[in-house]
């Protein structure tokens, strides 16, 4: 575990929000290039969902969504869980800390992942926010929505993710941010370290982090 920001002034952690792709499940680096190829988006600086939203007709938007959902369906079949997944789910459930998911994916892959890889007694999530909620990450709105529904302050919530969008959304919302490092996102610690409070390599490392944060908050 690597601490990039100080822990001073933190409150008791009452909720954790997880990204899904690359966070709860192992990274699938081929997926986003495949989506861009499917909709003819060559400019990597343009957000996929934003590109679709700006298409001129509803027919074109639907066709583009259908194409990326085919890619997501393939990815869904190949999903594998992150190391430490069950450990962190068990800890949060046992200690009454709210579990939530915020993803730019659609609902079906989330439901499939939860049923396939998380034991039923640990599989209850308070809120699952997908891309049907707008605006999506990297805007703070999805996380602020979850905090509001839970009746907690954003600073009492951790955002766990593997991407710029996750860290930007978490920081903008006022949450504590945890970057799950992998073989393709190390650049975030160099280029956007101001967005990351702590980086981990295994989801189970978050257990010790929460224990320390909640101990220090009293």
Curated annotation (Swiss-Prot):
The keyword NAD does not apply. InterPro entries: HAD-like_sf, HAD-SF_hydro_IA, HAD_sf. CDD domains: HAD_BPGM-like (cd07505). Gene3D superfamilies: 1.10.260.80, HAD superfamily/HAD-like. It is found in: Cytoplasm; Nucleus. The keyword Translocase does not apply. One of its GO terms (cellular component) is nucleus. SUPFAM superfamilies: HAD-like. Its EC number is 3.-.-.-. Present with 396 molecules/cell in log phase SD medium. Belongs to the HAD-like hydrolase superfamily. This is Uncharacterized hydrolase YOR131C.
């Amino acid at each position: 575990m690597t601490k990039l920001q100080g822990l001073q002034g933190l409150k008791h952690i009452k909720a954790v929000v997880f990204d899904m792709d690359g966070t709860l499940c192992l990274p699938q680096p081929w997926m986003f290039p495949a989506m861009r190829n499917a909709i003819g988006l060559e400019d990597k600086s343009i957000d996929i969902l934003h590109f679709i939203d700006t298409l001129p007709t509803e027919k074109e938007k639907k066709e583009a969504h259908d194409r990326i959902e085919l890619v997501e369906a393939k990815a869904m079949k190949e999903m594998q869980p992150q190391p430490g997944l069950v450990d962190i789910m068990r800890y949060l459930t046992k200690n009454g800390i709210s579990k939530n998911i915020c993803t730019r994916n659609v609902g079906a892959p989330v439901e499939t992942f939860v049923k396939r890889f998380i034991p039923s007694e640990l599989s209850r999530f308070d809120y699952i926010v997908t891309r049907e909620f707008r605006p999506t990450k990297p805007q703070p709105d999805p996380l602020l929505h979850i905090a509001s529904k839970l009746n907690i302050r954003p600073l009492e919530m951790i955002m766990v993710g593997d991407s710029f969008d996750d860290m930007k959304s978490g920081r903008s919302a006022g949450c504590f941010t945890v970057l799950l490092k992998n073989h393709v996102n190390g650049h975030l610690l160099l280029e956007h370290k101001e967005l990351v409070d702590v980086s981990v390599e295994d989801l189970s490392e978050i257990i010790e982090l929460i224990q320390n944060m909640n101990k220090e908050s009293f």
